Amino acid sequence: MKKLDWRKRLRRLEFNLRRHPITLVGDEGRPYRNALLIFCGLLLVLLLALFSREEPQLMASPEVSSIQDRAVLRVGVRYDVPALGGLEQELAQAMAQKLLSEADDSTRLSLVEVNPMTAFPKLDDGSVDVVIAMVSSSMASQYYYSIPYYSDPCLLVTLEHGPAFQLLNMELGVVQSNDIRKSPELLLLEAYTATHGDLGLKAKIYASYPDMLDALVRGEIRAVLLPETYVELYGDTYPIAPSTFSFGTIDYAICAPSDASSLADIGTLVLDGLMADGRLTAMYRAHGLDPARIPVQEP
């Protein structure tokens, strides 16, 4: 068998390209431009076909059919965080509109009050279909989540007019309300200390935000980790001062049960639409929220 001389073939290809270079300019480039346009058109048609098929498939899922048979979407929300809670209730309305567009808008949505301790149990026992109540995928990985709708910075907070201090070997207050899963603040602190071990930071655990802030006022600790939303919530009750230092963000998302992935995907479709046409920004402003907290979605 004759042995192939790849060097000769490469030289011949290089020679041909020099004689007939590929260009997109002028008359010589017209065939290539046409071919490129045809390719881009076919690719666009393929992508549109894929995306247009996704929504009907989601809307035909068993969990969506169950909600449509009931004609009511049950959403767990919070009432103790006015600004963000108002946004979340409006997102619940948008999701109900998506799932039950032909139902009576006065009855198609049932808002069920939840808190950090009851949100996931109500998902588990079927009391609610989804939760839109300041929950993050870092809290419990067994559930399904939409893309995030709010990024909440986790700030280092001290007493107002308190003395200056250094972080070295400090004990920081962190809320950890149950033994089943770590709080987002504790996870952020652990991630930070893993890369800044020389600081010797330690976590002092408290069962609730009032317990932790009471300890801060008593001088038991000198600083705490507190999401910005809670800084605003407790700022009128406690003499606290947030610093500009953030340990990261807690990204809140629409949460669906472990057997209802389509509801999380539909939540993503709803949020994508609200972001694309600017309605999410308008919702933020209507509830006094900073549009800079709208998460940057990764491609």
Describe the predicted segments one by one.
Residues R78, P148-T158, E228-D272, D290-P299:
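Periplasmic-binding protein-like
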Residues A96-D104, D124, V128, E190-A194, ...:
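Sec-exported extracytoplasmic/periplasmic mature domains
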Residues A60-E63, L87-M95, N115-A119, S127, ...:
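Stable alpha-helical elements in mature extracytoplasmic
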Residues R74-L99, L155-A207, T229, I266:
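Bilobed "Venus flytrap"/periplasmic-binding protein-like clamshell domains
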Residues G29-A35, L48-L58, Q89-L99, H161-R181, ...:
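Extended ligand-binding regions for polar small-molecule ligands
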Residues M1-Y32:
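N-terminal Lys/Arg-rich, disordered targeting/topogenic segments
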Residues T118, I132-Q142, D214-T249:
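A ligand-binding cleft/hinge motif common to bilobed small-molecule-binding domains
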Residues R30-I38, L58-M134, I205:
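Extracytoplasmic small-molecule ligand-binding "clamshell" domains
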